[in-house]
Structure formats: structure tokens, C-alpha cells
Amino acid sequence: VEWTDAERKAIASL
């Protein structure tokens, strides 16, 4: 399952 751009950005922000 792939994440959405918004979720991806949130995770990358960690």
C-alpha cells in the first residue's frame, strides 16, 4: 500500500 503525498510528507518530516 502506498501512502498519499500528504502522509508521505508527514513521515519524511520526522
From Swiss-Prot:
It comes from the Eukaryota. The keyword Cell membrane does not apply. Transmembrane segments: none annotated. GO terms for molecular function: metal ion binding; oxygen carrier activity. Disulfide bonds: none annotated. Keywords: Heme, Iron, Metal-binding, Oxygen transport, Transport. Belongs to the globin family. Involved in oxygen transport from gills to the various peripheral tissues. This is Hemoglobin subunit beta. It comes from Oreochromis mossambicus (Mozambique tilapia). The gene is hbb.
